[in-house]
């Protein structure tokens, strides 16, 4: 361990690995370098030392210079002598310093990342391939011309612009193009052998997921066959496949590999293939009168093929990485950063059996309205983190829209685990700005088998069962609660929602009216809404208004009723010039800030006076914003409309609410009026309500006046208005034209 720690400490020093690596690697590269003889002298076909020195400089920076100088002297001193070796060393050092400096200047950040990064392609092509090859050739030509490298004059020839120079230049470009990544890989492996494991892991990630072992084996077999053909010596039995035609076949084969297997594998494999091919060039390029030209063309093929293969490998790898990232992001909610419903569907598909849990948090809605959406985001994140220790591999918490979450569990002992999860949930504490918040969590679950074809329908059923869990304070099994009944109930809701939308679009609603008579002989009507069925039967509001409220259609229905009532009043202005109508409002409409503006616009459109409208409001816990509701009602009163509190005395409407309410009329709930004759307690309650209403200067309306005894009792209490079957039954709105006068006379 001490030896390893010491090695790690000194390996990047100038007297460590940088000092000895060039001396060790240059002799090996000397056997890989390939030379050819042409009419004008000797030329390079492949040259690696420059790529090694560029890689050393890029990796070790200034610490690489002593080792590079030492490596050149050790390798060339005996062959060239002191002065030529010194000149050659100066050439290399000038080149690599300029390349390294330019690259660092134009790529200041992350300049040493592994090769294959598309963001650095242009800088690396220029500073690590084109610029050093060009400068090396210029300095080499100059040194040979002035006599500093007299022994190497045969490598450059007398004239600088000839085929030999072009071949040398292409060889340097090819050597740098495939040699710099290769040398960089060798340096990293020598510096840290464990890098091989990391490299192999990255290599596997870059391979296309659809690649099979059989495909890869066939590809390697084809590649080996082409290499074997290139390495076979020419003879009288040789075919076209023993010529450089086979070299051209390498391109489509390597292109396929580049698109399928990734840059990490192809860059190394192509380097080996190209070095073997170039080293065996004499086997497929015969010597004949056009030998130099053919060698030049083949050398350019090495360069073009290398660039195409490497560039295609980089692009294909980058494209696969982008696609994988997009696919990964598609399964994660971008706000809460938890797996989404798509990820849940995939997990249910991959597992043969699963236990699906649903967590419903209804109290979160009010907290979000008061503290903002960040509370919900952090609550879900921390709740997911709280549940993570109880989850097995492959299980997860999934984000659902709104305030709910889902869990997928393995089926082993899922009943006991769900009970444990519920106990763990009850121990969860969430703090927001130092305040503890613990909304109740309802838990429902079911046992499902892959594939789950109707995930959204299933989640809707679990949501319904989770509401029962909030009441029972225990996890609820959907199968025991009757899945078929829940499915039918949910389908009926969806069907009713569609019918409501059709009714709004095609005016399939029907308005009825019930008279309300006053003690002084005045009469107004309450508008009652019905919906036409498929066979023109009338559907009562109890069947569709709860669905309308749940799916957010109640406000649209209210506006439909108001507009069609005003339209009726405008069309019959002559027959009923001062008649009033009472219209029921849903809690959603009352909580909308723009509702008074819309009412004002409709009144102006149909030229109806505001005092002719009475809006009946039921005070209930469905009022999501009580303050806004009070502002809306105040604006309606300022507009000239009257406000009536409906169904007073039951549920949410109580004496405590009466203290703060500001209305014009108070409608006593029919449950008190119905028994006012037979139940003295109901009589006293009604009397107290009337007394309080008079103190608030409100008129009182009695509902459910169904017989003469009730009517006499109501009159004795001094109630201002009466409504019920004794006064008049609900009739189509159009019939009110014929009922107004008889009702007034009877009153």
Curated annotation (Swiss-Prot):
Free-text activity regulation comment from the record: Inhibited by pGpG.
Keyword Membrane set for record: yes
Gene ablation phenotype (knockout): Increased biofilm formation but a decreased tendency to sediment and aggregate. Cells are more sensitive to peroxide.
pH dependence comment: Optimum pH is 7.5 for the truncated enzyme.
Tree of life domain: Bacteria
Catalytic reactions of this protein: 3',3'-c-di-GMP + H2O = 5'-phosphoguanylyl(3'->5')guanosine + H(+)
Cofactor(s) named in the record: Mg(2+); Mn(2+)
Enzyme class: hydrolase
Major site of localization recorded for this protein: membrane
Inducing or repressing factors: Induced by FNR. Expression is highest under anaerobic conditions at 28 degrees Celsius in stationary phase.
Stretches assigned to the EAL domain: 493-744
Topological domains, Cytoplasmic: 37-42, 103-128, 189-215, 260-265, 318-747
Membrane topology category: Multi-pass membrane protein
CDD domains, per the entry: EAL
Location(s) in or outside the cell: Cell inner membrane
Molecular function, one GO term: protein homodimerization activity
Transmembrane segments: 15-36, 43-65, 80-102, 129-151, 166-188, 216-235, 240-259, 266-285, 295-317
Documented EC number(s): 3.1.4.52
GO cellular component, as recorded: membrane; plasma membrane
Keyword terms, alphabetized: c-di-GMP, Cell inner membrane, Cell membrane, Hydrolase, Membrane, Nucleotide-binding, Transmembrane, Transmembrane helix
Protein's UniProt keywords contain Transferase: no
Cofactor: record remark: Mg(2+), and possibly also Mn(2+).
Periplasmic side: 1-14, 66-79, 152-165, 236-239, 286-294
Job description of the protein: Phosphodiesterase (PDE) that catalyzes the hydrolysis of cyclic-di-GMP (c-di-GMP) to 5'-pGpG. Truncated proteins consisting of the GGDEF/EAL domains (residues 319-747) or of the EAL domain alone (481-747) have c-di-GMP phosphodiesterase activity. They do not have diguanylate cyclase activity. Cyclic-di-GMP is a second messenger which controls cell surface-associated traits in bacteria.
PANTHER family noted in UniProt: CYCLIC DI-GMP PHOSPHODIESTERASE PDEF
Protein known as: Cyclic di-GMP phosphodiesterase PdeF
Organism of provenance: Escherichia coli (strain K12)
Name of the gene this protein is made from: pdeF
